[in-house]
């Protein structure tokens, strides 16, 4: 099992990741521009090995529980710098882990709408130390706006990905999509997780988050 101990954006926050694209929802707009594909081969190999381990969820869950028990100093943990919740049992495994390790704040982003629904992973059912943020994309190239379906959009905080080359145009589109009131409550990520922390405990009442395309 491979746990990453931070990076230039996240600071010292550890994370568990899976391979890009193959664990993500089919047709996601970020696939062609996925920055993870530029990672060093050794890092990507580690993600592949994590995915192989994730085919045996009981073993993975035991290894993760052992790791968290041995790293008591960890207070924030990101699930998936790369990858997504590829199945209902896999998402439920992470929810069980969060319930077991209440002193750690887990956070993640997802585009796996069907997995979330089938897991009944609505915010009121999630442990307080498990933050799930849904991702949305503004138009990029020939891709249209890509938003979570309304039932999920109304329940979760949303992360909007904006292309800095078309920021003004995309902000206009975003306001039309979500309305002025929701846009005014949206906060922008500073680009450094360790200093920012907007995502760690996010709930819908806290507003959405704006990210710049890598």
Report each predicted region and the residues it spans:
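Class I S-adenosyl-L-methionine
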Residues: 1-214
